[in-house]
Amino acid sequence: MESIPLRKKILETIVSKSTLKQKVFDNTFATFNDLKETLLEMASEMDDQLDGLLDRRVRLEYRDRGKFEAQIQVANALLIFQMHTDVFEFGSDHLIWQNPYVQADRDNSYCGLINIYNFLSDSFKFNRNADEGYLIGRIFINRERRYFAEGKQQNSMRAMDFGKSEIGQEALVAILESAIGFALNFDLLMPPYEENKRVTVDQFNTKMDNSKFVTGKRLGYDFDVEDI
């Protein structure tokens, strides 16, 4: 049976989109593995540099949590790096569409995503499931390993710089150091008194048994304009 024009177009789209997205995924996955190796090296180097300068209980600890997640604990801050398994295109109002590199070829806009979250380490240690964290950064990688970063203090490669450089270890170190620096200076805020002044005996006992008085850092996907 001969392919009708529409079917032919569908088949061509399947081939082109699948090839494009697979390339983006492969680049993002390779970058995430590079990120994990860089994190491990940074944690080891900084831990050695801190030796003798502070309590041994305050260390940098790297944890590999599988193919798509890694963590680094710095004092009471826990940074979680998570690679999304899907490939994305940007909304029509995103700044990326003003970038000449993307305007020259729409396929350049398809990106893989690595999220950077900031939590309190005790939230996981004591299973405080109600505690909140904060998305502090995102790394985007495309089919050509070109990249840019969004988030708090991520100034190394903005959306309008997308296409100028391939992501490598130097870029990863800059992104990771910015994320760690921000997390260390993002202190826990005291909850308002009015939100905590009344508690039942059952609530108190339950929370004490599980160390679950709600604390934490905010979680959200919205960045301020100056962060993008």
Per-range role (PLM):
Residues 1-22:
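N-terminal, Lys/Arg- and Ser/Thr-rich interaction peptides
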Residues 2-9, 55-57, 62-82, 104, ...:
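Intrinsically disordered, low-complexity linear regions
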Residues 13, 17, 42, 175-178, ...:
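Residues that form generic nucleotide/phosphate-binding pockets
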Residues 18, 22-36, 158-169:
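Short, charged/polar micro-motifs that form catalytic or ligand-binding hotspots
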Residues 23-69:
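Short N-terminal edge-element motif at the start of the domain
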Residues 135-228:
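Glycine-rich, aromatic-bearing surface loops/beta-hairpins
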